[in-house]
């Protein structure tokens, strides 16, 4: 089974990462601060290891057919995707497709590789967990087609400290400003 290489353990990364590990996937977790990644995964049982993040570390551990998931700031995505292409590994991120990322598409296609971006809402991969919650409800003993529910996601945090954006900056402020110009609707 291919290894999943998970880059970054920020606030939006942990639920999806835990789900992969708990479902039996082999994962190498890369983080700038190893102790923070270990703390974030405390109590999680499964096949994973934590190593310091660097492009060189990903190059050392990733192999052909592996999957690299980048939850890093957007400026890392293109260099990581380029590395993935050179290693014959697949790449996934939650970020919007930049022109530089779009330019990598033909090289990936020629090698039969997937470069998957814009997974779900930005910050993306974490929000796929909402689909898992809906599915758990549908499979539960309390599910009924007659029930009516709503689900609202703000894709971030409401700030305890008032600011002009009414937003808690827990990820890239530039990313927050860019996402503010886009709209998204999801029907679950």
What are these regions (language model features)?
Residues 4-9:
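Conserved N-terminal Rossmann-fold NAD(P)-binding element of oxidoreductases
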Residues 11-13:
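Hydrophobic/small residue at the entry helix of a nucleotide-binding pocket
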Residues 27-41:
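NAD(P)-binding Rossmann-fold cofactor-contacting core
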Residues 44-55:
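Rossmann-fold cofactor-recognition segment
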Residues 66-71, 91-93:
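N-terminal Rossmann-like NAD(P) cofactor-binding module of classical short-chain dehydrogenase/reductase
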Residues 83-101:
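ADP-ribose/adenylate-binding Rossmann-like module
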Residues 95-117:
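Rossmann-fold NAD(P)-binding glycine/threonine-rich loop
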Residues 113-187:
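Rossmann-like dinucleotide-binding core of oxidoreductases
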């Amino acid at each position: 089974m291919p290894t999943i290489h998970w880059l970054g353990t920020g606030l939006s990364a942990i639920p999806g990462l835990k789900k992969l590990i708990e479902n039996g996937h082999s994962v190498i977790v890369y983080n700038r601060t190893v102790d923070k990644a270990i703390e974030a995964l405390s109590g999680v049982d499964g096949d994973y290891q934590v190593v310091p993040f660097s492009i060189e570390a990903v190059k050392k551990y990733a192999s052909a057919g592996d999957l690299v998931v980048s939850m890093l700031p957007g400026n890392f995505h293109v260099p990581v995707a380029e590395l993935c292409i050179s290693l014959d590994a697949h790449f996934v991120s939650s970020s919007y497709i930049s022109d530089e990322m779009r330019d990598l598409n033909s090289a990936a296609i020629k090698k039969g590789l997937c470069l998957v971006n814009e997974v779900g809402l930005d910050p993306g991969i974490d929000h796929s967990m909402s689909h898992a919650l809906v599915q758990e409800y549908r499979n539960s003993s309390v599910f009924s087609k007659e029930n009516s529910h709503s689900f609202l996601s703000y894709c971030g945090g409401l700030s305890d400290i008032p600011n002009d954006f009414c937003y808690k900056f827990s990820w890239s402020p530039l990313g927050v400003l860019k996402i503010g110009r886009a709209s998204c609707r999801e029907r679950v």
